[in-house]
Regions:
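Metal-dependent peptidase/peptidase-like ectodomains
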Residues: 1-28, 58, 112, 124-221, ...
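Soluble non-cytosolic domains of exported or imported proteins
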Residues: 2-6, 41, 90-98, 128-132, ...
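Short Gly/Pro-enriched turn/cap motifs at secondary-structure boundaries
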Residues: 38-44, 194-198, 271-273
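Short, solvent-exposed loop/turn and secondary-structure capping segments
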Residues: 14, 61-62, 73-78, 131-135, ...
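C-terminal recognition in membrane/secretory proteostasis and scaffolding
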Residues: 254-364
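Soluble metallo-hydrolase cores and metallopeptidase-like ectodomains found primarily
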Residues: 1-89, 102-105, 109-116, 139
Length: 364
C-alpha cells in the first residue's frame, strides 16, 4: 500500500513520532482496515466555440463540427504511460479543426444565393472526457434552431490520409441519401464506409438526438494519444482532399434542397466510456484486410502482455470470427475483465494464437 506524505505524517504522529512502536504487520492472515480521507473534486470549465454562416432566412441548418481538445500533458487516456510531455494532438484533432475552418472559409466567400442552407460550425470542448462538449451543445440548442437542423458532419483525425491510411466515412446508414450522395462527391478518392452513426466522437451526440450524421476519419496510427502526434506527420494535401469532398457533400445538400431522412442503425459498439473491457489494441481503421489489423498495442495493456504486436491481423476472439471492425467491436460485449480468451491472428502470413486476459477499462 502506498501512503503519501500527509498520510505518513498522520501515522507518525499517531505513534508519538516513533515508527518502531507501530504494530508489526505480517505477510499472512486476513485483516480489515478503515481509512477516511477527504476528497475534493476538481471542477474545470471548458467551452465550445461556434459560429453561424447564415443562409436564406428560415433555411434548414447543417452542422459542421470537430473537437478542439486533446490530452494536455497526458491523462489516463495517454498511450505513452509514465511520460509527462505535451500531447499536441496534431491529428487528434487539430486536423479536424483545420478542415472545418477551411470549409468555413470557402463557404463564407460564396454569395448567399449559392448557400441556401445555414451552416453552424462548432469546435467542441471536452470530447476526450466523454463527448461532453457536443452533448452540452445538443442538449442546450434553442428549439427553433434544433427544429431546422437536418444533418451533422464531424471531422476527427483527418490528417493522415495516404498510401497506408484510407479515408473512412462512417454514418452511411443513418440516412438513405448518403450512399448515393457520397459516391458521386468522392471523386477519385477511394473510401471505406461504415453504416454506424455511433462511435467515440462527437457525431454520436447528434445521432442520439435524431440527426443523420457523417463522420470523416483517416484512421488511428502508432502516434495516437502520444506526444509524437505532431505536425510533421500531417498530410496537408490529404486533409485538403477531405475538406473538398465534404464541401461537395454540403454544396449538393444545400443547392439541391436535399433533406436527409433519419434512419436508426443498430449500435455495433458501446459508446465512449461504455466498454466492459480494455484490450489495449490500436486498430487500423483503414486496412483492407479480412480481419482487423493492429497499428500498435498499448504498452502494459492486455494485448501487449499477450504478445500481440503491430501488424498482427486479428481473425478470431474466443469463438467469434472477426472479419471487420464491426465483428471486432461486437466482441467487447461478451468479454469479461480477468477472464482468459483465445485470440487468433495472422502474423507475417502465418497463423498465431495467444491467450489474452482483458483488463477492466480505466476510469477518468
Amino acid at each position: 500500500m502506498w501512503v503519501g506524505r500527509p498520510g505518513s505524517e498522520a501515522l507518525r504522529k499517531a505513534f508519538g513520532g516513533k515508527p518502531d512502536k507501530a504494530p508489526k504487520v505480517g505477510r499472512k492472515g486476513k485483516g480489515k482496515a478503515t481509512i477516511d480521507t477527504p476528497i475534493e473534486p476538481i471542477v474545470l470549465a471548458t467551452a465550445n466555440v461556434s459560429g453561424v454562416l447564415p443562409g436564406r432566412e428560415g433555411s434548414p441548418v447543417l452542422v459542421v463540427g470537430a473537437h478542439m481538445d486533446h490530452l494536455g500533458e497526458g491523462t489516463s487516456s495517454s498511450l505513452a504511460p509514465g511520460v509527462k510531455a505535451i500531447h499536441n494532438g496534431a491529428d487528434d484533432n487539430a486536423s479536424g479543426v483545420a478542415v472545418i475552418l477551411e470549409i468555413a472559409r470557402v463557404l463564407g466567400a460564396l454569395p448567399v444565393a449559392e448557400r441556401p442552407y445555414t451552416v453552424c460550425f462548432v469546435a467542441f470542448g471536452a470530447e476526450e472526457m466523454g463527448l461532453l462538449g457536443s452533448k452540452h451543445y445538443v442538449e442546450n440548442l434553442p428549439p427553433a434552431l434544433r427544429g431546422r437542423m437536418v444533418a451533422m458532419l464531424n471531422f476527427d483525425m483527418v490528417g493522415r490520409l495516404g498510401s497506408e491510411q484510407d479515408l473512412v466515412i462512417a454514418g452511411m446508414g443513418t440516412s438513405s441519401v448518403w450512399p448515393e450522395l457520397v459516391e458521386r462527391t468522392r471523386g477519385t478518392q477511394e473510401i471505406r464506409t461504415s453504416d454506424d452513426g455511433y462511435g467515440a466522437s462527437d457525431q454520436t451526440s447528434f445521432y442520439e438526438a435524431g440527426l443523420p450524421v457523417l463522420h470523416f476519419f483517416t484512421g488511428t496510427h502508432s502516434d495516437y494519444h502520444k506526444p509524437s502526434d505532431d505536425v510533421d506527420k500531417i498530410n496537408f494535401a490529404g486533409a485538403a482532399t477531405v475538406a473538398d469532398i465534404a464541401l461537395r457533400v454540403l454544396h449538393a445538400i444545400s443547392t439541391e434542397g436535399i433533406m436527409p431522412d433519419y434512419i436508426k442503425v443498430a449500435r455495433t459498439a458501446p459508446a465512449r466510456g461504455g466498454f466492459k473491457v480494455s484490450l489495449g489494441t490500436i486498430p487500423d481503421y483503414g486496412a483492407k484486410v479480412d480481419g482487423v489489423r493492429l497499428t500498435g498495442v498499448r504498452e502494459g495493456g492486455a494485448a501487449a502482455k499477450a504478445g500481440l504486436r503491430k501488424g498482427d491481423v486479428i481473425q478470431r476472439i474466443g469463438e467469434r470470427e472477426v472479419h471487420n471492425l464491426d465483428d471486432y467491436m461486437a466482441t467487447f460485449a461478451v468479454l469479461e475483465p480477468g477472464k482468459e480468451v483465445e485470440v487468433a491472428v495472422e502474423r507475417e502470413g502465418k497463423p498465431v494464437t495467444v491467450t489474452l486476459v482483458p483488463d477492466a477499462p480505466s476510469r477518468r
